Regions:
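Conserved donor NDP-sugar-binding/catalytic core segment of glycosyltransferases
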Residues: 8-58
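Glycine-rich phosphate/pyrophosphate-binding loop
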Residues: 68-81, 214-247
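A short, conserved alpha-helix in the catalytic core of glycosyltransferases
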Residues: 76, 82-133
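Short beta-strand-to-loop acidic/aromatic patch adjacent to the donor-nucleotide binding site
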Residues: 1-9
């Protein structure tokens, strides 16, 4: 099956390399190259050339880290990734059903990352195919608002609690709390009071629901090797590493 947003435009023969990969590796989840419909030479914010997360659940992509979006120079080859964008994702119906689909409690934002993390824990592979290309209207054109900020921060905490190895959960959540407090003051300094408050609303909602989240953790193995770098926040904001190949 293909999960695709209604603001995605496909290209000629885009399905051929996807079908070849699925025929050879039916237990794969696949993402094509996602470019910006409004700026066709650049990657698109939501997915780019495939996604990853750091130790604390902050997402980033090959071709896009935070607000730095790279020009597409075919610099990212076919490779295994950690998460596929929900803007365009291919997988078998069996995988989608076996994993229970997207988590409805997320409502919107980060549900595809949670889904791919569950797939990773179950032993499925997520793969990027550069020769399949689509264009997405996308997230970069949507101004950040307090609702989106709330859902992004809340759902990230939900996702961590569902998928982290239990032994590292408490320490990771504590560090995330500290990092999110620092992030909230960044909004406050810029005068974005509603976004500032949304982070605390997200944490409040998380703590209200944490017991339920813990009781609903699945019985599969929660793998510890889900991240490649400890902190994308530190790499990007402190060390100034703005592009994936700098990491």
């Amino acid at each position: 099956i293909c999960i695709i947003n209604n603001d995605v435009e496909v290209t000629k023969d885009w399905l051929k390399p996807i079908k070849e990969r699925l025929n050879n590796y039916p237990n794969s989840i696949i993402q094509p190259k996602i470019l910006d419909l409004n700026n066709a030479n650049y990657f698109e914010y939501a997915g780019a050339a495939g996604g990853f997360i750091d130790k604390y659940g902050y997402p980033y992509c090959r071709g896009r880290i935070f607000d730095t979006i790279e020009k597409d120079n075919n610099q990212y080859a076919d490779n295994e990734i950690f998460w596929s964008s929900g803007a365009c994702m291919f997988l078998s119906k069996k995988i989608f059903i076996d994993l229970g689909g997207f988590d409805k409690t997320f409502f919107a934002h980060m549900e595809e990352i949670d889904f791919c993390w569950r797939a990773f824990n179950h032993g499925y592979s997520i793969y990027y195919i550069s020769s399949s290309k689509v264009y997405h209207q996308g997230a970069a054109t949507i101004k950040l608002n307090s609702s989106k900020t709330y859902l992004n921060y809340r759902n990230s905490l939900f996702m961590l609690t569902k998928n982290l190895p239990l032994k590292s959960l408490v320490n990771t959540i504590i560090i995330r709390l500290i990092m999110d407090i620092l992030s909230s003051f960044r909004f406050l300094i810029r005068g974005e009071v509603s976004n500032f408050l949304s982070i605390y609303k997200a944490h409040l909602d998380y703590y209200i629901n944490v017991k339920k989240l813990l009781s609903n953790r699945n019985n599969y193995i929660n793998k510890p090797n889900y991240f490649k770098i400890n902190s994308i926040v530190y790499k990007y904001f402190i060390l100034g590493k703005k592009k994936f190949f700098h990491l």
